[in-house]
Each structure stands twice: as structure tokens, then as C-alpha cells.
Amino acid sequence: MKFSKTRIPYRETIRKAAEANYRHKKQSGGAGQFGEVYMRIEPWYEGMAEPAGLTVRGRDVYNLDWGGKLVFYNCIVGGAIDARFLPSILKGVMEKMHEGPLTGSYVRDVRVSVYDGKMHPVDSNDISFKIAGLQAFRQAFQQADPQVLEPINHVEVLCPEDLTGAIMGDLQSRRGIVEGMDT
């Protein structure tokens, strides 16, 4: 029999709302890179009301491969950021959701509302807004009381009666809850 180290499928999420902005600005001779994003992130749950105090212009719901959802709102008014840059901002957010800041685990059940930003007619491009979206999400996530979600499994343990005490002690030392015993 071969044993290997078990990879526990932790997830990360947030417990409160937070706002952040990030300006990506890089100049090196020719055309540079510029993109600025303002966003609010909140814990997401089914049946949640629209974002308070923001004008919603678009909403997309993404079922994440690792479980949970990302709800992405376009709340930009007045053309502060062209709509063509929103997919790049989303890519940056999704990239950061693949590796949360606490354990490097996937992030789930978050609502992101992009509500403002700035662009430059020459220096703004997709990579600038991807980086700005990723960094704004990272900053907001750290301010939003992040938490690690641990998996819960129901297991049935069969053992000889003389080992019952030792096995129960081991399970409880690992925060296991014994729901019943049969002999």
C-alpha cells in the first residue's frame, strides 16, 4: 500500500465588504501602460440585493469550477472606462481568485462591483486593466476580513471494540465530531 500526503481542498472567502483602487502606470520610452480601477467586493449569497449606491449597467454570474460563484457587476457611468476593458478587469480578478492570499487556495462566493476608473487614450490597453483589476481585487480582499473555509466530510469508521477509545480520541483531536456509535 502506498500513502501520499493528502491535499486538503481549502477555499477562501470574505466576511465583509471592502473597496479598493489600483492605478497601473508604466512608462518606458514609447507607448506606456495605464489603467486605473475602483471596485467594491462583498460576500455573495443567493437572493442578495443589487449593490447599494451604485448604478448597475451589467451583471454576469460565473459558476466557478472549484465551487461557488463570482458575481461581476459593471457599475461604471460616464465612460470612465471603456466597456472593452471590462473583460480584462474580469481576467485579473479571476486570476487572483485562483490563488487566495491566505492559503493560496481558490476563492469563492464573492461579488465584485467595478464602479470607476481612469484610462488614457494612447497608453491604456488590456494588460494594464488586467493588472489593475488583479491588484485592486487583491487589496480589497485583504481588507474584507478573509477567512479559510475547511471541508467537512461525513465518514463511517469500522474498528474493533478494543480500539474504539483510541480512535475516538484521534478523531476529536482533529476536530472530528462523533455523531453516534454502534457495537
Predicted regions and their residues:
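Accessory interaction regions appended to the cores of large information-processing enzymes
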Residues: 1-183
